[in-house]
Amino acid sequence: MNTCLEGMAGEPLPYLIQSDGRVTTLMFLCILIVSLAFSKEKKYLLQQAKFLFINRERSSMFDETNVIDVRYFVLLVFHACIITGFCLYSYFTEKVPILFEKIPHMHLLGGLIGIIPIYMLIKWTLYGIVNWTFFQKVKNSAWTTSFFNLFIWLGILLLPLVLLVVYLDISSPTNLYLIGFVVIIAKIALFWKSFSNFFEKIHGAFHLILYFCALEILPDFVLWKGIELVSNNLILKL
């Protein structure tokens, strides 16, 4: 006689990002990268943070604050890509929740993180082509340094916010406002560096607006709408 009894199927628990060991590993890696970089390159990082908001007339080739070990530079850019990907993940989990019901969270998080270095490479290439065509080599070099230093600092400033979002589960409007505030400050700093580096005279304001909108705002808009379009297509197909 068969004595096996079938029980009622349980309801699956919702995905909790703070309980995912892979996410915890990524967060630990980010904290480790920032801690290691500050322990070795603190003087450079703080000096470059100051130069994001003031215009340095000239720099000395013997000034050691102008040089960073390329290993820490690459690690900090990698860290900024991870953190920016987490910010996109936080936004789209709230705005397109149905997508995360169809595709595993870690697959989407990995995809969003992977988009960032590709996007930054494309944007850097566009900046390089335009700057090489219209501006001097010295100014182009200074701009490239400022561009990546700003991206590095964006990742550093967003790290504590991402930790709060992941582990304290801050409500959606609050975390989006905080992240948005940091991003806006970064855009303002980038706008200022564009002006001080390439358009020092006030009559260049119109060209600055065209330059900034075409190479900074438009690519961001295309990235945003591109992710939304892909998300909608995935929802329809899955």
Predicted feature locations:
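Alpha-helical transmembrane segments with an aromatic anchor "belt"
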Residues: 90-167
